[in-house]
């Protein structure tokens, strides 16, 4: 417990909140270039080959991003738009690629939740 004089000298500092996506620098999205596109295996109870990409952002930071949806057209040097949002079973993956923006194609034959995967409305 500080003394009254210590509080007069220094005061109480409000707690500083830590962001869960620091590379975005308080922006909603950031653009970047894929430096590597590969698959990764998830943590213990799950088993799969998750599609991830290493992306160098316009601010120079390099991050690992998850590519959602079935199938993708990304390769090295593709320009992508990323957003925040971690993948719970992939350690170190704190960002998502936005499907249907820039070089990333939307998911083909997607009927439901289309807006999340950049899929156009099918011709009825």
UniProtKB/Swiss-Prot annotation:
GO terms for biological process: translation. It comes from Solibacter usitatus (strain Ellin6076). This is Small ribosomal subunit protein uS12. Residues 1-25, 104-124 are annotated as: Disordered. Belongs to the universal ribosomal protein uS12 family. Keywords: Methylation, Ribonucleoprotein, Ribosomal protein, RNA-binding, rRNA-binding, tRNA-binding. Part of the 30S ribosomal subunit. Contacts proteins S8 and S17. May interact with IF1 in the 30S initiation complex. It holds the Pfam family Ribosom_S12_S23. Residues 111-124 have a biased composition (Basic residues). GO terms for cellular component: small ribosomal subunit. GO terms for molecular function: rRNA binding; structural constituent of ribosome; tRNA binding. PANTHER family: 30S RIBOSOMAL PROTEIN S12 FAMILY MEMBER. InterPro entries: NA-bd_OB-fold, Ribosomal_uS12, Ribosomal_uS12_bac. The modification 3-methylthioaspartic acid is found at residue 89. With S4 and S5 plays an important role in translational accuracy.
